[in-house]
Amino acid sequence: MAKIQFSRGLDEVVIPEVRLTRSRTGDSGTATFIFTNPKILDQGSTEDITGMYLSDEEGEIITREVKAKFVNGKPEALEALYVMKSAQEWDRFMRFMERYAEENDLGLSKAEK
């Protein structure tokens, strides 16, 4: 099962908006995840955000690049950035996203030029 966590053991139920960029050569890319009002930011949550963990049957992809966005002093969103430095990392990430998308009924749309 493909899942996203910000604190180990606590699955995030909010589905993110994901934006992908890839170099022309295909050997690097970035994925930006935007979670609006994620569960981890609920008032009752006492868990620390230690990174973003993308887990599936192949293993785990980890990024520590997680930032909170605040509106009127209250956390409203999380933005996580995952940088891929090789074609292999890109392929692994895409396999995770295919599983995650299938399990959460998500689709892929290309940006307008």
Curated annotation (Swiss-Prot):
Topology in membrane: Peripheral membrane protein
Keywords, ordered alphabetically: Membrane, Photosynthesis, Photosystem II, Thylakoid
GO biological process: photosynthesis
Primary residence: membrane
GO cellular component: photosystem II oxygen evolving complex; plasma membrane-derived thylakoid membrane
Regions crossing the membrane: none
Keyword Iron-sulfur: no
Location(s) in or outside the cell: Cellular thylakoid membrane
Subunit structure: Part of the photosystem II complex.
PANTHER family associated with the record: PHOTOSYSTEM II REACTION CENTER PSB28 PROTEIN, CHLOROPLASTIC (PTHR34963:SF2), PTHR34963
Family: Belongs to the Psb28 family.
Identification of the protein by name: Photosystem II reaction center Psb28 protein
Originating organism: Nostoc punctiforme (strain ATCC 29133 / PCC 73102)
Lineage summary: Bacteria, Bacillati, Cyanobacteriota, Cyanophyceae, Nostocales
